[in-house]
Amino acid sequence: MKKTKQPVIVLVGPTAVGKTKLSIHIAKAYNGEIISGDSMQIYKGMDIGTAKITSEEMDGVPHHLIDIKEPDESFSTAEFQQLVRMKIKEIAARGKTPMIVGGTGLYIQSVLYDYTFTDEKSDPAFREEMALFEQQHGPLQLHEKLKAVDPDAAKAIHPNNVRRVIRALEVIHTTGQKMSEMQNGHQEVPLYDTAFIGLKMDRELLYERIHQRIDMMIDEGLIEEVSALYQSGLKDCQSVQAIGYKELYTYFQGDCSLDEAIQQLKQNSRRYAKRQFTWFRNKMDVTWFDMTPPCHFSDKKEEIFAYIAGKLGLKAKL
């Protein structure tokens, strides 16, 4: 008798495409609980820059893996995989539907597929050498090093995320294995019965929404939020490598004007959105739904509910 896989709903897409609102509608319709698939929303005190969902927006839907780490703590893909798989079991045991929402492709891929990690080997001297190289030549040159030896990992990791770039280089250095190939047998069949929903939008409109979101973040206190982290002495932590924090750090360090930092933030956010879409399109079996106006939210929601019903056999509570 064939073993039935656990149904899981996954909602992905680039930043500012509208995942948050739709995720709540889906969770309510399918008695779901949401697991954050965002690599930076795990950090406490980093609310505005990560576009963290508010308690009002949650509207009573339980959310997991938000605010579980201090900003000075590190967090790995392997740890994320372990925590999410545990949460999926816990949610299912309560008779609820597990749902993953986010945009960090490698993290989500590690959960859904038979993705195993090499032993956590490290070489402090090599890391120090790469950190010195980055200080002398800048993050783009360091990223080029990674691109030369592991192009797939380079596509998934932003040049500003120096810690992850160095870690990917360190994996190759210590194990001889590419981080992007740490997938057992390149297993392509998901471990779960997955309804994989992707949201997309006309690029120019998406970029406009990204700019509006950043302007809103600044109005809501992003500069003050980043300043508090900077003043607390957090300088080389994984958390402040995130888009929205790294750029403003250059301003606080006196390397550029505030306007230049904001423009760089907008540019990096656009590039990241493009990379997010490319990653999910190329790496996973996503069914895409176009959210470009004049589509009506209610009509698009019904399309997605029909897809979930066909894929998982789940009936929405309307």
Curated annotation (Swiss-Prot):
The keyword Nucleotide-binding applies. One of its GO terms (molecular function) is tRNA dimethylallyltransferase activity. Residues 38-41 are annotated as: Interaction with substrate tRNA. It comes from the Bacteria. It catalyses: adenosine(37) in tRNA + dimethylallyl diphosphate = N(6)-dimethylallyladenosine(37) in tRNA + diphosphate. Its EC number is 2.5.1.75. The keyword tRNA processing applies. Substrate binds at residues 15-20. Its cofactor is Mg(2+). Pfam families: IPPT (PF01715). The record marks 104, 127 as: Interaction with substrate tRNA. It is an enzyme of class 2 (transferase). ATP binds at residues 13-20. Keywords: ATP-binding, Magnesium, Nucleotide-binding, Transferase, tRNA processing. InterPro entries: Dimethylallyltransferase (IPR039657), IPT (IPR018022), P-loop_NTPase (IPR027417). One of its GO terms (biological process) is tRNA modification. Belongs to the IPP transferase family. Catalyzes the transfer of a dimethylallyl group onto the adenine at position 37 in tRNAs that read codons beginning with uridine, leading to the formation of N6-(dimethylallyl)adenosine (i(6)A). Monomer. This is tRNA dimethylallyltransferase. It comes from Bacillus pumilus (strain SAFR-032). The lineage of its organism: Bacteria, Bacillati, Bacillota, Bacilli, Bacillales.
